[in-house]
Structures are given as structure tokens and as C-alpha cells.
Amino acid sequence: MIPQTLEQLLSQAQSIAGLTFGELADELHIPVPIDLKRDKGWVGMLLERALGATAGSKAEQDFSHLGVELKTLPINAEGYPLETTFVSLAPLVQNSGIKWENSHVRHKLSCVLWIPIEGSRHIPLRERHIGAPIFWKPTAEQERQLKQDWEELMDLIVLGKLEQITARIGEVMQLRPKGANSRAVTKGIGKNGEIIDTLPLGFYLRKEFTAQILKAFLDVKPL
């Protein structure tokens, strides 16, 4: 069922909290892979199916009619994020005139439904649990941090300084190659303004940033 309101979406997300991947997959008649080595997007697909997400692999938000993006957040036993979070691909060409205010990144992060999930690899996939959902909108300070990182990284792209981009740049968000392998190639702008072949780059939220979101939720959650 596709949720028609934020309340319906949150209610559906709360109804699957506490289930294991195996329990939810069996309910939806979805086969469970042994591990995620060849099925990296399986958990996201499972939760999208369970919650009625509409976007599929399109660039729009997962629940575009509600203005909500769905993000899974693998955490360890201490509740700390295990990996960075992919937001969107960076526009490496045809990017003149793009501002933070009309960027894909800002659009995707304007309202997020985070679903924490058990991510420790020693737990068999079928037995990993789904956590309680978190509705999140960036605070003014978080938006300032995201905008600052986005503008710094986009300046390097637009100015043809792709070779200067490293994962160390950015306070809360970084740019990293996005692709199944290093043979994935796209077009970008070279240092002399020419079009070159380069690796696709994606914006990723740092683990420290998503840990902050989790902590804020846990700090205000009633007992």
C-alpha cells in the first residue's frame, strides 16, 4: 500500500520495527540472499517494497508525493553508523547555474525517513533486525554545514579541478567515486574546460553526521 500521508508512512515504518529481514521478506515473498556482496541494494529494496515507495531508481525522492526520502542506516551493536550514506550523483557536466537551493542533494535531504538496521556482518542477513524509524529535517546548522560542503565541492567540479577532489574534503559530506567498479566512466570538465572521461562521483554523508542525527533522536525519545 502506498502511504498517502506522513502519518501513514510513519505508522507503516513503526509496524515493521523489531522484525528481522527474514520475517519481513517471508511476509512479502521476497527471497533472502546469503549475504549482500552481490546484492548491495537488497535491504533498501525490501524496505521500499514494505513501505510502498514509488520512485524506484529515479532521481526523485522515494516518496515524492510526500516529499520524503527513505534511507537505511546500518549500525553496529553500539548504535553507531557503519558506513557513509549515499545521497546523489554529482553533476559533472551541464552544471552552470546550479545553486544549493535547487540542487539534488538539498532536495533529497529536505526530509528523510531514516530506518536504522543491524549491520554487523557476523549476524546472518535473515536475523538482522529493523530499527525504529526517524523522521528528520536538517536543522539550520546542519543545512549550513551541508551547503558549505556542497558549494566547496561543486566549485572544484565546475572549475575543472576533479583531480584535487579527495574524500577528506568536506566537514559533513564528501565526494567519492560511485560505481560498481573503476571501469565505470562518465563525462566531466577538465582543467582547461575540455570534456574528459572520468569516474562518476557521488555525494556521501559522513558517519559522524548521521551519528549526530541518531543521537538527537535518542536524546529526545520518551522512555
UniProtKB/Swiss-Prot annotation:
Keyword check for Transferase: no
Domain of life: Bacteria
GO molecular function: DNA binding; endonuclease activity
One GO-annotated biological process of the protein: DNA modification
Compartment(s) of residence: Cytoplasm
Keyword Iron: no
SMART domains referenced in this protein's UniProt entry, alphabetically: MutH
Gene Ontology, cellular component aspect: cytoplasm
Keywords: Cytoplasm, DNA damage, DNA repair, Endonuclease, Hydrolase, Nuclease
InterPro entries per the UniProt record, alphabetical: DNA_mismatch_repair_MutH, DNA_rep_MutH/RE_typeII_Sau3AI, DNA_rep_MutH/T2_RE_sf, Restrct_endonuc-II-like
Main localization of the protein described in the UniProt heading: cytoplasm
NCBIfam families: mutH_TIGR, PRK05070.1
Similarity comment: Belongs to the MutH family.
Function: Sequence-specific endonuclease that cleaves unmethylated GATC sequences. It is involved in DNA mismatch repair.
Record protein name field: DNA mismatch repair protein MutH
Native source species: Haemophilus influenzae (strain 86-028NP)
